[in-house]
């Protein structure tokens, strides 16, 4: 289950915060018009004990003192939060019934990695270039096109998804994350390396002008 809402309140414009709670995590950032974007994700096991979102927030999310302070000291912009259920981070195939999958349809990375949109753009770029090569006769058959895309997709994204899934599992487990955060603080180079594994290399676009 993912829940998103916009609120007005006091929060730095140059900060993106990530806070966890039992069974999930919440991202906080300033967006346009001085609005604070609050978005959290949790699993069904953590949520099913409660009647509604309000009760879940009061009894679970607000156990995190930082989230409690942000929610309680802000004014909602939305009448009701936006929600979406049945989100799947399970493995998918870049090719389905001979159709090329791009973005989340090929594999959805956890939101805490903050890299879903760039993955969608990058996979579309990869698919476009291979399709152009196919239409120009540089790739001889549709089967070769599919194999080339699958190989390129796995090389570009498979590790990112695995690392993102691993990081999300750790972050949604309070005791484990509380134990690991001090360790990460003691090893300054560790966090940038983890982030790099979920983001890959910068995308290069060739100008045809």
Locations of regions flagged by a protein language model:
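Glycine-rich, flexible loop/turn motifs
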Residues: 3, 12-17, 67, 80-85, ...
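Short capping/connector residues at structural and topological boundaries
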Residues: 12, 23-26, 30, 36, ...
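Generic recognition of cysteine residues
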Residues: 26, 39, 102, 113, ...
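Conserved FAD-binding catalytic core of PHBH/FMO-like flavoproteins
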Residues: 1-62, 66
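C-terminal helical "tail/cap" subdomain of flavin- and related membrane-associated enzymes
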Residues: 132-209
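FAD/FMN-dependent oxidoreductases across multiple families
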Residues: 48-131, 136-139
């Amino acid at each position: 289950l993912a829940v998103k809402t916009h609120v007005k309140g006091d929060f730095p414009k140059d900060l993106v915060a990530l806070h966890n709670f039992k069974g999930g995590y919440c991202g906080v950032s300033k967006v346009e018009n001085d609005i604070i974007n609050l978005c959290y994700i949790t699993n069904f096991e953590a949520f099913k004990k409660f009647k509604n979102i309000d009760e879940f927030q009061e009894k679970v999310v607000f156990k995190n003192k930082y989230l409690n302070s942000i929610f309680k000291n802000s004014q909602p912009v939305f009448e009701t939060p936006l929600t979406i259920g049945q989100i799947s981070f399970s493995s998918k195939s870049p090719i389905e019934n001979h159709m090329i999958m791009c973005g989340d349809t090929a594999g959805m990375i956890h939101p805490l990695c903050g890299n879903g949109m760039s993955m969608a753009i990058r996979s579309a770029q990869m698919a476009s270039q291979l399709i152009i090569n196919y239409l120009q006769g540089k790739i001889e058959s549709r089967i070769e096109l599919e194999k080339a895309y699958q190989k390129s997709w796995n090389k570009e994204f498979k590790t990112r998804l695995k690392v993102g899934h691993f990081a999300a599992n750790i972050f949604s487990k309070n005791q484990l994350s509380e134990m690991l955060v001090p360790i990460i603080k003691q090893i300054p180079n560790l966090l940038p390396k983890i982030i790099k594994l979920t983001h890959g290399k910068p995308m290069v676009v060739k100008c045809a002008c």
